[in-house]
Curated annotation (Swiss-Prot):
Name of protein: Cytochrome P450 6a22
Gene expressing this chain: Cyp6a22
Family matches, as InterPro entries: Cyt_P450, Cyt_P450_CS, Cyt_P450_E_grp-I, Cyt_P450_sf, Insect_CytP450_Detox
Matching SUPFAM superfamilies: Cytochrome P450
Keywords, alphabetical: Endoplasmic reticulum, Heme, Iron, Membrane, Metal-binding, Microsome, Monooxygenase, Oxidoreductase
UniProt source species: Drosophila melanogaster (Fruit fly)
Source organism phylogeny: Eukaryota, Metazoa, Ecdysozoa, Arthropoda, Hexapoda
Length: 499
């Protein structure tokens, strides 16, 4: 009995020593950091009463400009580099990219196939896969998909009008409507299927899309473990995505492939590219589903939230809304009343509005990278980064830094005029990342967002109402930025306002 007690005491002492030593890592190196608590490190309250930005942004604000190019924090027991210097961020993403190719995110192609997509995979797989998928996102392919997205935009206009006519005082929850629009767009462009989400909120494709982002397979502590120690989680064959969601997307891809191959259907879309890769033996059905899923994931929640945030800000500032609407109307007049791919390129103020929306609400509010080798930050050996160490670039904190964007809480599209852009470092705006691993679907996302805004603003006026939150609160359980309480706006048809 005494031997057992002695062993337990020794184990506790060793554990205490290990935790204390681990949590003194940054202090021993002379790097600024906040005190950590076992077992969550600096992640206390994460996904409960704090969003990730609520944890990271104060650390960025406290330690930026203190002489070191980064601060330290802990994801559970894992010490993570928090980049506070924009020149270092640029070096990580662009100049020294070869050392920071990997994102260090959880992926498990064997047991959790939908996680094996381009955004998550690391090592030798990601570069050839990106090169093969890049042709889908060229300007020529965007021009080809433009009419399809516009068709969904027209349906969005019809559905929005019907909902506004039937709603009490014309008040609509915009976020869900935007999600149904983006799910229909991506269903057609990525999966080659008609989703009918706009007409039917209970359409399976739209429901599965919402579930893929909102439902957690595990409790917060287990999720935190998977995200903090992805290699260990992969070794333990842990999974993040519910099986029925995986089965749904794999099933859609399998059925689409079978139909196209049997009927000889060839389209210039994303699914056709995946089929060609499968026929060359480069992808399995499960791997195809993972790539189609990330097309969906990257365009569904991100573009839907961006549309909602943009309409929210335009509703709060009617003068900006009127200015953007006038630009849209002028572009239509110059093109005989038609909205074309060329006329979309002429919407300069639209570009400013979208850029400022993504500045204030970067949907992915942080970027992660892994250092492959020992690295001296900015050439200073004192500020070294160890091999295998995770780095985090706090996009939200950078975008809300008053030294870069005075009065960052205000929505000012003119921040992105050429003369103001020239005054800021290139790493001051990172909604799509930067460098060789920037967002591959950036063009598609911008096009989808632009068409959505054009479809709505040429037909409707948006204004705040008693249910509009004065400030958007973010859903704490989501690593992305999305509204916790929806976005309620009053929607009026322009034709009825002028009559």
């Amino acid at each position: 009995m005494l031997d057992v007690v002695a062993l337990l005491l020794i184990a506790l002492a060793v554990g205490f020593w290990f935790v204390r030593t681990r949590y003194s890592y940054w202090t021993r190196r002379g790097i600024g950091s906040e005190p950590a608590r076992f077992p969550v490190g600096n992640m206390e309250g994460f996904r409960k009463n704090k969003h990730f930005i609520d944890i990271v942004t104060p650390i960025y604000e406290k330690f930026k400009g203190n002489g070191a190019p980064f601060a330290g924090f802990f994801m559970m027991l894992r010490p993570v580099v928090l980049v506070t210097d924009l020149e270092l961020a640029k070096q990580i993403l662009i100049q020294d990219f070869a050392n920071f190719e990997d994102r260090g995110m959880y992926h498990n192609e064997r047991d959790d196939p939908l996680t094996g997509h381009l955004f998550r995979i690391d090592g030798p797989k990601w570069r050839p896969l990106r090169q093969k998928m890049s042709p889908t996102f060229t300007s020529a392919k965007m021009k080809y998909m433009f009419p399809t997205v516009c068709e969904v935009g027209e349906e969005l206009t019809q559905v929005c009008g019907e909902l506004a006519d039937n709603a009490m005082c014309g008040i609509l929850e915009i976020g869900d409507l935007m999600a149904r629009y983006t799910s229909d767009v991506i269903g057609r462009c990525a999966f080659g299927v008609e989703c009918n989400g706009l007409r039917n909120p209970e359409a399976e494709f739209a429901i599965m899309g919402r579930r893929a982002f909102s439902e957690r397979r595990h409790c917060k502590l287990v999720d935190g473990f998977i995200e903090s120690f992805p290699e260990v989680a992969r070794f333990l064959r842990m999974r993040q995505i519910h099986q029925d969601i995986t089965d749904f997307y794999v099933g859609i891809v399998r059925e689409t492939v079978k139909q196209r191959e049997e009927q000889g259907i060839v389209r210039s879309d994303f699914m056709n590219l995946l089929i060609e890769m499968k026929q060359r033996g480069e992808l399995t059905i499960e791997e195809m589903a993972a790539q189609a899923f990330i097309f969906f994931a990257a365009g569904f929640d991100t573009s839907a939230s961006t549309l909602g945030f943009a309409l929210y800000e335009l509703a709060k500032q009617p003068a900006l809304q009127a200015k953007l609407r006038e630009e849209i109307d002028q572009a239509l007049r110059l093109h005989n009343g038609e909205f074309t791919y060329d006329s979309m390129q002429e919407l300069r103020y639209m570009e400013l509005v979208i850029a400022e929306t993504l500045r204030k609400y970067p949907i992915l509010p942080q970027l992660t990278r892994i250092s492959r080798h020992l690295y001296a930050a900015k050439g200073d050996r004192h500020f070294y980064i160890e091999p295998g160490q995770m780095l985090l670039i706090p996009v939200y904190g950078i975008h809300h830094d008053p030294a870069l964007y005075p009065e960052p809480h205000k929505f000012i599209p003119e921040r992105f005029l050429a003369d103001q852009l020239a005054q800021r470092p290139t790493a001051a705006w990172l909604p799509f990342g930067d460098g060789p691993r920037n967002c591959i679907g950036m063009r598609f996302g911008k096009m989808q967002t632009t068409i959505g805004l054009v479809s709505l603003l040429r037909n409707f006026h948006f204004s705040v109402c008693p249910r509009t939150d004065p400030k958007i609160e973010f859903l704490k359980s989501n690593i992305l930025l999305c509204p916790a309480n929806g976005i309620y706006l009053k929607v009026q048809q322009l034709s009825q306002m002028s009559s």
